[in-house]
């Protein structure tokens, strides 16, 4: 089972809130509209949207809640918006187009690895919304940010929504066992299954209780400062915006350095081996 199939299965089992037609998904969409409405007042966004047209690239978009919300906010300001959505899940790609159409947003969508997204050209806004960074290990994150920076127009802006996951775990402790979906008809849980010291990933088994189907996925936890400082390697200026939700932030970046391109980041020896070298 490749990573796209594992993600399909993981989202199916845990039923994370990326379905825009569910009550939880509608709530997320309304929250995103409000969030981006306020973000549009940031000086970097004000400068960027002073023209009459803007292009958006939504990386790891899921079913498009974040990208469609951002597009709607900018369209309501009178801008012509072109939205490009990419995700590794085939079902999410299909649903994102359906959702965008329902909301009157002009969109294209591709099943594609976000690390390869720079091949699609350059955009005014590159968005990473929701839990996308949790799917990228410590070696994949620089590749993701290199791709985002390379896909950015010279005066463009990168927008990353993320939790300060290290702070959350430090304050509340790491949980071995989590109820992912409490609904009786779709009850699912996750259980800690190990740790990969090379990639910095915590492995979790996601289990659907009614048939005990299991998929193992890596999860990655970072602080907001780590995300911001890593993005800074690829973009000259960085800002952090606090949202109304506790421990949830928007990290902004602008002015691509273009010194380190995605194709320069070849796998190092330790990642190829998959484990530390043992001198014993």
What do the PLM-derived regions correspond to, one by one?
Residues 160-228:
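SAM-dependent methyltransferase
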Residues 60-64:
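Class I SAM-dependent methyltransferase "Motif I" SAM/SAH-binding loop
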Residues 124-140:
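A short SAM/SAH-binding and catalytic strip from SAM-dependent methyltransferases
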Residues 233-280:
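C-terminal lobe and adjacent flexible extensions of AdoMet/dcAdoMet transferase-like proteins
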Residues 67-116:
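Class I SAM-dependent methyltransferase SAM/SAH-binding core
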Residues 1-53:
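Conserved class I S-adenosyl-L-methionine
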